[in-house]
Amino acid sequence: MHYEVIVDTGILLALIDRNDSHHTWVTERLKEIAPPLLTCEAVISESWFLLQRVKRGREALLQLLAQKQIIIQFDLDAELVTIMALLSRYQSVPVSLADAELIRMSELYPNSLNVYSR
């Protein structure tokens, strides 16, 4: 069975930043997974901001997108009502927009591997 893999900001940061404490672990795990990795624009935006101090980090992020290693597979316009409901439902947690989009993506891709932590 083929699985789509949904990634969050932490995975992208660890993949790109060689100084990240999880870099080796993430790169080893991703060798086992066929691209593309799925994500959303909110994750790309968070990653862009957090990569500002990583030498060539933003360039690496754009290259991953250009090479289709990572693809944006979420349409906020189409899912806005559901996202608003998720943000309301989890307001006590709280969740970010990126978190809500990833939750929705896991619902849209039931065969996804979306919990990827050590």
Model-identified regions with their sequence ranges:
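Metal-dependent nucleic-acid phosphoesterase active-site entry motif
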Residues: 1-20
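PIN-domain endoribonuclease scaffold, especially VapC-family toxins
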Residues: 3-5, 24-94, 104, 108-112
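Conserved residues at the C-terminal ends of beta-strands
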Residues: 117
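Detector for Asparagine
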Residues: 19, 111-114
